[in-house]
Design a protein with these regions (language model features):
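Catalytic phosphate/metal-binding cores of nucleic-acid and nucleotide-processing enzymes, i.e., regions
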Residues: 1-102
Length: 102
């Protein structure tokens, strides 16, 4: 993988809300729905990509890119998945999620 990356750290103060599905910015960025739509460009295409960028335009702390891969960083352990599931690691205090474009 190469290209620009986005690092997102989610602290414990947000995690309980995110795990419950409260629609915080952090939840929206990591939700399975958004990742599926961004990962499968062959199905949704460039027009959908533009719509997603427009929908997220108000989030000034996020550089919006057509992200395809996600890498979890939980201490020294990392795992690459196409779909992010934040419920997989409920005991960690924070997540640094690195998304990299192809």
């Amino acid at each position: 993988m190469n290209g620009e990356t986005l690092d997102l750290r989610v602290f414990q103060q947000f995690f309980d809300q995110i795990a419950k599905g409260v629609k915080t910015t952090e939840y929206r960025v990591m939700s399975e729905y958004w990742m599926k739509r961004l990962a499968d460009t062959s199905k949704y295409g460039d027009l959908d990509e533009a719509a997603l960028r427009k929908a997220m335009a108000a989030d000034t702390d996020i550089s919006w890119k057509p992200w395809r891969f996600a890498r979890f960083h939980c201490g020294k352990r990392s795992l690459t998945k196409r779909i992010i599931s934040i419920r997989a690691y409920p005991s960690h205090e924070w997540f640094a999620i690195k998304l990299a474009s192809e």
